[in-house]
């Protein structure tokens, strides 16, 4: 191989290595974003479950009160 070909090959390899490093950094950022979103999603699911339980409790109370009103009428 000529020196020119080796130089071109070295340049391409260096560019490829730089691209790989950039992609690794982007991947790490995306992993962190994913982790943050997963935690937020978990919190929202827990909050949703709590609100559904509160709604069910209120529905029971309202149903009970409506039953009392109907029995008095």
UniProtKB/Swiss-Prot annotation:
Any Gene Ontology biological process: division septum assembly
Region listing for Disordered, in residue ranges: 30-50
Location in the cell: Cytoplasm
Primary location recorded for the protein, binned into one broad class: cytoplasm
Domain of life: Bacteria
Low complexity compositional bias, start-end: 41-50
GO cellular component terms attached to this protein's record: cytoplasm
Coiled-coil annotated residue ranges, if any: 3-69
Keyword line: Cell cycle, Cell division, Coiled coil, Cytoplasm, Septation
Any Pfam family matching the protein: ZapB
Subunit and interaction comment: Homodimer. The ends of the coiled-coil dimer bind to each other, forming polymers. Interacts with FtsZ.
Function: Non-essential, abundant cell division factor that is required for proper Z-ring formation. It is recruited early to the divisome by direct interaction with FtsZ, stimulating Z-ring assembly and thereby promoting cell division earlier in the cell cycle. Its recruitment to the Z-ring requires functional FtsA or ZipA.
Family designation: Belongs to the ZapB family.
Record's protein name: Cell division protein ZapB
Protein encoded by which gene: zapB
């Amino acid at each position: 191989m000529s020196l020119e070909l080796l130089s071109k090959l070295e340049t391409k390899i260096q560019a490829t290595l730089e691209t790989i490093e950039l992609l690794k950094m982007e991947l790490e950022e995306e992993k962190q974003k994913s982790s943050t979103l997963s935690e937020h999603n978990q919190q929202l699911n827990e909050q949703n479950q709590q609100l559904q339980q509160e709604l069910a409790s209120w529905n029971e109370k309202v149903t009970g009160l409506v039953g009392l009103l109907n029995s008095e009428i």
